[in-house]
Each structure stands twice: as C-alpha cells, then as structure tokens.
C-alpha cells in the first residue's frame, strides 16, 4: 500500500516537473511562431537559437520588486494565483497511465478543476481593488461558465460512446478509427471551447489590452504574475493533451501522441497570430446558440446509437 502511494506521488511529481518545463518551451515556441507570423526572427540572442530565453525571463521576473496595492485584500490577493496554479496542475491527475497505481478513472474530474478555477479569477480581480481587474475577472467568469457547458456536453457524449469515465478507454476505442472522423464538428467546437476556456485569442476578453490593460492580473507582478502565467500555459498544454486523447487516437504511450499534442498547441499559437478579437455579444452567441445546440444534438445522437446497439444485442 505504501509502495503504491509512493509510486503515485513520485510519478505525479515527475509529470508536474515535465509540464512546467514544457510550459517554458511552449512560451518559446509561441514567441518564435508569432515572430515568423510578423516576418521577424523572434528571440534568438540568448544561448543557442534563443533556447534558454524562457529561463532567463523567469529569473528576471522573480528578481523584480513586488508592490503591495494599498487598498487590496492582502491574503486573498496573494493566495488566488497559488490556488490557480495548484488547480491547473492537479488537473493532470486524469492523464492516463498504463500502470495501476497511477490510473485515475474519473474523467469528469477535470470539469471540477476548471469550474473551481473560475473562483480564482474572480477573487484575483476583486481582491486587487482595481476597476480594470474587476471588469476583467467578471468577463472571465461569464466566458468560462458559458463554454464549460458545451465542454461538459461534448465530453459526456463521447463518454456515452465508450461507456466509461476512464480516459484509458479512449485509446482502446480508437484503434481502428479516430473519433474526429465521424465527429468533426464536435472536435471543432471542443477546440473553440478550449480557446475560450483558456482565455486565448480570439476570446481574450479578460485580457483585452485596448480596454482593460492586462485584465484581472493587472495588479500582479513578479511571483503572482508568474504563477498566473504558468497556470494559463499549463491549461493550454492540458487542453491540447485532452484533444489529442479524445479525438486523435489517444495512443499516449507512443511518440506520435506527443507530436499531436505539440501540433494542437501550435494551433493555439497560430490562432493568436491570425485571428482578431471577437465582439463580446458574438462570443456569447457562439456559446449558447452554436456550440450548445451542436453538442446537445451529438449527445442525443450518441445516446440513441447506444440504446439501439444494446437493444439489438
């Protein structure tokens, strides 16, 4: 029993370290890709091809001074970025392992973590006691809650298809045909919902530079800003992993799975470099009038398929 617990903790710690390192290289990839989209080089001065750039940025961030907003709620102001990063790392528990001691059979757990992360945005904006931060946090809360509904329905429809909450089953059921082949509209809506869930372009209303300066994290610098930054980018990697697992075969023990994960992460960056920001009413219309009916139709269709299949048997 103690051995199983020790192995679980050790494997989870290794996974978290790998996620944090991959966040550093995702930021480097984003800056390189955006550089080539802007017809420039991107970071290439620090070390070989600019590879140590994210680590030097991290050192620079942590060496900065931490200002304390005079009218802020001190404890909540400092605690919310920590809680945000903790949730975005705990969410990786559902990453499927082939070993028994690390298998986590509850796939809907990630929805609990994403729902709780809404509170961190809200508390961060409110405790900063800044109008810009409060407006950014309110936008983020409305946006995240709206798109979580379609995310939950998409995941539920595919879980009904495989008949289990265990993410391991997605690999077994996609041996001969990927789910993206017969549910391509569902995959597109899942990707769009992931963009909105992680506050990325074209849904970056929580961080609209022209309106809210930096959004809910405007009063944070050094450590607090770094933790929010790490949480956002680890969520991007997690959503890319989930997309690859659910729609692109889910063969997570092979090299191709991580290649597909990197490709989906590249699409996150590519969308940022090419698409303009949506209007806020169009964002809500897209969630409630496009994604929600689509995911509900697929849900009823897959339920009907399951009932018909089991009645034939």
From Swiss-Prot:
Q: Which reaction does it catalyse?
A: a ubiquinone + NADH + 5 H(+)(in) = a ubiquinol + NAD(+) + 4 H(+)(out)
Q: Where in the cell is it found?
A: Mitochondrion inner membrane
InterPro entries from the xrefs? NADH_UbQ_OxRdtase_su1/FPO, NADH_UbQ_OxRdtase_su1_CS
The record's section on Pfam families has: NADHdh
Broad class of the protein's primary localization: mitochondrion
Family from the record: Belongs to the complex I subunit 1 family.
Give the protein's function: Core subunit of the mitochondrial membrane respiratory chain NADH dehydrogenase (Complex I) that is believed to belong to the minimal assembly required for catalysis. Complex I functions in the transfer of electrons from NADH to the respiratory chain. The immediate electron acceptor for the enzyme is believed to be ubiquinone.
Query: Which protein are we looking at?
Result: NADH-ubiquinone oxidoreductase chain 1
Name the species this protein comes from: Locusta migratoria (Migratory locust)
Query: Which gene produces this protein?
Result: ND1
């Amino acid at each position: 029993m103690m051995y199983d617990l020790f192995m679980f903790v050790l494997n989870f710690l290794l996974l978290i370290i790998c996620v944090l390192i991959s966040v550093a290289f995702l930021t480097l990839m984003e800056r390189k890709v955006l550089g080539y989209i802007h017809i420039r080089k991107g970071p290439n001065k620090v070390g070989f091809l600019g590879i140590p750039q994210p680590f030097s940025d991290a050192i620079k961030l942590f060496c900065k001074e931490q200002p304390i907003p005079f009218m802020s709620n001190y404890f909540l102001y400092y605690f919310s970025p920590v809680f945000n990063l903790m949730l975005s790392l705990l969410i990786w528990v559902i990453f499927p392992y082939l070993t028994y001691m690390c298998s986590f059979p509850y796939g809907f757990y990630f929805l609990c973590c994403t729902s709780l992360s809404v509170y961190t945005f809200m508390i961060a904006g409110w405790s900063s006691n800044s109008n810009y931060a409060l407006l950014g946090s309110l936008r983020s809360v409305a946006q995240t809650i709206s798109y979580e509904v379609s995310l939950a329905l998409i995941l539920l429809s595919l879980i009904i298809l495989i008949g289990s909450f265990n993410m391991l089953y997605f690999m077994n059921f996609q041996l001969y045909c990927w789910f993206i082949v017969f549910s391509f509209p569902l995959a597109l809506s899942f990707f769009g919902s992931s963009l909105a869930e992680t506050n990325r372009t074209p849904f970056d209303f929580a961080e609209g530079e022209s309106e809210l300066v930096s959004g809910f994290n405007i009063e944070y610098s050094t450590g607090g800003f770094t933790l929010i930054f790490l949480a956002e980018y680890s969520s991007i990697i997690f959503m890319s992993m989930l997309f690859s697992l659910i729609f692109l075969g889910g063969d997570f023990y092979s090299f191709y799975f991580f290649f597909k994960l990197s490709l989906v992460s590249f699409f996150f960056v590519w969308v940022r470099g090419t698409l303009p920001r949506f209007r806020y009413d169009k964002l809500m219309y897209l969630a409630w009038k496009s994604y929600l009916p689509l995911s509900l139709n697929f849900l009823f269709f897959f339920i009907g398929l399951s009932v018909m299949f089991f009645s034939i048997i």
